[in-house]
Every structure is written in C-alpha cells, then in structure tokens.
Amino acid sequence: MNNIERSINELGYAVVPITGTSMLPLLKEGRDRVELEPCSQERLKKGDVVLYKKNDGTLVLHRIIKTKNREFFTVLGDHQFKNAERVNKNQIIAVACGFFIKGRYVTEKTRWYRMYKKIWLCNLNFRRIILAVLSLKK
C-alpha cells in the first residue's frame, strides 16, 4: 500500500499533486492538486474522476466515460480521445471530491466545472477538435 492509499484509508481523504498530462486542460502538473476520498462503486457515475490502480501497480487519475454495469468502468484522461481503459471496480481506489486549480477550490457544484464536464463528455470527436485548437494557441 502506498502513501496515497494509506492516507485515504486512515484519514478518509488525500490531497495529491497532479503529475503527467493526461488530465489537461483541466488539471496541470506542478500547478494543481486533487482531493480524493474513498468511494462506493455503487455511487460512481459517468463524469467522475477516479484514482485506480493498473495491473502493474501504477496509480492513474482518469475520468469515467462509460458505466454499463457496476462491475467495470471505461475511463479516459481528459487530454486523450483514444485508448480508453476498462477498469474493474476493485481497481478503483478513490474518487475526486474536489480540485485545487490555480489555487482555487473547485467541486461538482462549481458552475463552470459542471459545464466543462458536460462539454468534455459529449463527444470524443469534439474533444479531438478542442484539443487541436488548444494546442495551436501554444
């Protein structure tokens, strides 16, 4: 068990810095953090950001894009439009209950975040176009 899992199990939450680029444009490495809490697989839904453990032990933070049953979930990083992974419910360690983005605390109740989530989940082809436009701005 690593420090993140230990904190979630013992304290009931963990605040973790973002690493990697798979959750751009929402979450940026070196700038943002995610607040995680234990989750009940029965309450997980499309759009939730979850921390799961891959078979090799790597921890990954991605968004649920499909829930067909309560046994498996399809997850994908916000900065991706292909290579979605099918995750067993037992691999899911925690769910994001909030984010520290540019120093501000954001939750499911934050209006702009709800809009972002709807847009981001609506269509993977649309996501590809948005990511292409955002990469041109750099």
Question: What is the predicted function of each stretch?
Answer:
Residues 1-138:
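Extended hydrophobic leader/signal-anchor segments used for secretion and membrane insertion
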